[in-house]
Design a protein with these regions (language model features):
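Phosphate/dinucleotide-binding and metal-coordinating scaffold of catalytic cores
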Residues: 1-324, 328-426
Length: 426
């Protein structure tokens, strides 16, 4: 079991962290060689200081696993963690600490942080990936059957190891994988190796992944998410290029990775990680706090207006899964911070559900029943110009969502169930 690990960023050592087994806590210190580089990978709570040791015992154990937020952002989320736990079971290992998890990921994390020493998780050959097999193996890897792995042939074990490599670094709850994709040929390869010519890095959300046996039919989430991507673009909100890959009646949602540019890694921090705003504590934070973080990162006014546009969109289309991991920031090699492109911008509302019955972050002190006046008050307090025009445009464009949804082949019953919940008259 690993207790000490090194952190690298942009080809240079950032620091070292040690696991305190008694306190179940990591202690991080910046490398002396990193001090004076002019880079601040976590400037709000972990500014670069010589001799300063960072540890945080008062933040959520379930989310941060005893790590500082800067490092915890690299941990797998619900789906990735499930894959990792199944891989541990398959290989006869016990669940390790957070340091061991990061060493397993090594250079395969989202963003640009890399961890050493890397565990024995080989990248696998650069071969073409068949999506139908990926869906099947992902479903088997998530199976809760006790006999999982007991009688698997070596070929299937290797396939499951591959989906673990492709899926553990991706965040969120839905089944997904990190891939290299060639839009011209439609060919899919592993996203954990250097992308061949003509390929770029994408995240694919797999349609039809279940823990049940037999053919996995479409659940239409890919088509639904793609229809909202189209709506996001029409509202003038920045989002990475997205598309659908269809096979066997299923539609997998594909989004270009914004933490990779021209094959280079880009350092990324979520609002959760950079400010320790625990996304598992619903209705504990506000959009006002997000704007305060943006000011601390010295983001320009244009990005504040962009964030306001996203906030209004979330209200109008009832994206109430708007938690602190669904806002991210990017830092380039010169240390300049920017707001990342938007992601996970779709309908998420269940009046009977504990999570999405209300917004996760408040606006003008409210998590529910947010009005136009609340949006205008927010704009006034945060010096956002043209707020009325932004609200009007997003409401008007969103009224055309059913047309976009039908063009994306979203089933009519799904459209009919969603449409009455949109706040088009705000």
């Amino acid at each position: 079991m690993e207790d000490i690990a090194r952190v690298n960023l942009y080809g240079q050592p950032v620091g070292t962290f040690r696991w305190d087994n008694n306190r179940q806590l990591a202690h991080f210190e910046y490398a002396e060689s990193f001090i004076g580089k002019g880079l601040e990978p976590s400037p709000i709570l972990m500014p670069v200081r010589q001799g300063r040791i960072y540890s945080f015992s008062d933040i959520g154990r379930e989310t941060f696993k005893g790590l500082p937020g800067m490092l915890a952002d690299s941990l797998p989320d619900t789906y990735g963690r499930a894959l990792f736990d199944r891989w541990l079971a398959l290989t006869g290992r016990s669940s390790g600490n957070a340091v061991e998890t990061l060493c397993f990921l090594g250079k395969r994390c989202m963003g640009a942080l890399e961890f050493e020493p890397a565990m024995d998780a080989p990248y696998g050959p650069d071969v073409r990936i068949e999506l139908d097999s990926l869906v099947e193996v992902a479903s088997e890897a998530l199976s809760e059957k006790e006999e999982f792995g007991a009688n698997l042939e070596e070929a299937k074990k290797a396939a499951i190891a591959e989906i673990v490599r492709l899926g553990t670094s991706a965040g969120g709850q839905r089944a997904k994988a990190i891939i290299a994709y060639n839009p011209s040929t439609g060919e899919v390869r592993s996203g954990q190796i250097e992308a061949p010519e003509g390929f770029d890095y994408y995240l694919i959300k797999l349609d039809g992944v279940t823990a049940e046996a037999g053919f996995r039919e479409t659940q239409n989430f890919g088509r639904l998410e793609y229809s909202f991507y189209q709506l996001v673009k029409e509202c003038g909100i920045e989002m990475s290029d997205c598309s659908l890959i269809e096979e066997n009646g299923r539609a997998h949602f594909l989004t270009k990775r914004f933490d990779r540019q021209n094959g280079e890694k880009i350092h990324m921090q979520t609002l959760c990680g950079i400010a320790h705003y625990d996304y598992r504590n619903p209705r504990s934070y506000s959009y006002e706090q997000a704007f305060n973080v943006m000011r601390a990162l010295r983001l320009p006014y244009s990005q504040a207006q962009e964030m306001y546009r996203r906030m209004v969109f979330n209200v109008v289309i009832r994206n109430q899964d708007d938690h602190t991991k669904n806002i991210s920031f990017l830092m380039d090699r010169q240390g300049k911070w920017t707001l990342s492109p938007a992601y996970d911008m779709g309908f998420a509302y269940n009046p009977k559900g504990g999570w999405t019955a209300q917004h996760q972050m408040s606006i003008n002190g409210k998590f529910d029943d947010i009005t136009r006046q609340d949006l205008l008050e927010f704009a006034r307090h945060n010096n956002i110009k043209e707020a009325t025009e932004i609200i009007d445009r997003i409401a008007e464009v969103s009224s055309r969502w059913p047309l976009l949804a039908r063009e994306c082949e979203v089933p009519q019953p799904m459209i009919d169930a969603i449409m009455p919940n949109l706040k088009l008259s705000i």
